[in-house]
Structures are given as structure tokens and as C-alpha cells.
Amino acid sequence: MSRKVTLTVPVDIVVRDRDVHVLALVKKRSGASSHGVSASIRSFADELDVSLDTVRRALASCEEAGYLTVRANRMKNGGQLENTYCVTKSGDGLIEAARRAGLIS
């Protein structure tokens, strides 16, 4: 007979500093909302004082690693709106680990 169990296993992972900061900003902006935050890449770049490409790379890296989901938003006429970014449970875990390590406040 098999049963499902949940195990928490400490694993060392390597993440870029920029990824952690961008992920933490998404979490901060979304607050308690489980729906995430709709924001422009430029607004993230301005707040973190980094380039647009740096934010794009960080968002893509976080999405690929499963720390973040990205949903494209469109107007009725097909025009592009700001994407919606939502931090996943594993992203929350990464943010907490970064806080404990003193990387972010």
C-alpha cells in the first residue's frame, strides 16, 4: 500500500542576486494578493535601479526555475497590457531563505 507524504528536504541551490531581488520586489508589490501584480518591466527596473534587460533576464530565469508565473494580459482589440506576475510557493521559499541569509530585508 502506498501513501503520499510531504517531505521538506534542504537543498543547496544557486541563484543570481538579481533574481532574488526581482522576485522579492514582485512579492512586495503583490502584497497578500494571491493574484499577483500587474506591472511593467520598466517600473521594476526603475525601482531596482537596473536595466530593462537585467529585469527581463531575472524574470525569465525565475519563471524557468518555477519561482514565478507570468500571465500576459491583452486588451479587447488585441493590444498588449502589462503582464501579471505571481510568486509561486517555491518562490516564497526562496525569498524566505534569502531573508534568513541576509540577502534581502
Where are these regions (language model features)?
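Assembly/interface hotspot detector across virion components, adhesins/toxins, and nucleic-acid enzymes
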Residues: 68, 72-73, 102-104
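Short recognition helix of helix-turn-helix/winged-helix DNA-binding domains
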Residues: 1-47, 54, 60-69, 76-82, ...
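Short, amphipathic alpha-helical interaction segments positioned at domain boundaries
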Residues: 89-105
